[in-house]
């Protein structure tokens, strides 16, 4: 039995070493500058503020309600809500960017953010 390299020419084989496993669809290249700035901001919050506290919460079986207030103050609980009602007034791509960055750290907080 032949393997794929015997049937497919070298030029047609995918170069998996250059494949971006963190962004397989080159999603980041399709974002506007504002969406990229939002992504960086939320990623910073998720990595620097959320992740250490979640690790502690898992270890001690606790929850910190102030995290919800902080997320609300940043507008993460109302990304698509108009600014006059306290939201960010952004579109659904921005909402997806926010959800993805929170999800990278914890799916529970992403779920809470989505259904609040």
PLM features: residue spans?
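Mature N-terminal segment immediately following signal peptide/propeptide cleavage
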Residues: 29-50
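A structural motif shared across PLP-dependent enzymes of the aminotransferase-like
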Residues: 39, 62-66, 87-95
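Short secondary-structure junction/hinge motifs that connect adjacent elements
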Residues: 52-73
């Amino acid at each position: 039995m032949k393997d794929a390299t015997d049937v497919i020419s070298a030029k047609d084989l995918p170069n998996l070493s250059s494949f971006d496993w963190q962004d397989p669809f080159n999603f980041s290249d399709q974002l506007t500058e504002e969406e990229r700035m939002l992504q960086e901001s939320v990623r910073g919050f998720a990595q620097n503020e959320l992740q250490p506290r979640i690790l502690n919460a898992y270890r001690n079986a606790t929850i910190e309600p102030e995290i919800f207030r902080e997320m609300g103050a940043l507008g993460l609980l109302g990304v698509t809500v108009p600014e006059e009602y306290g939201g960010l007034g952004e579109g659904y791509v921005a909402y997806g960017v926010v959800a993805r960055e929170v999800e990278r750290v914890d799916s529970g907080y992403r779920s809470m953010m989505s259904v609040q």
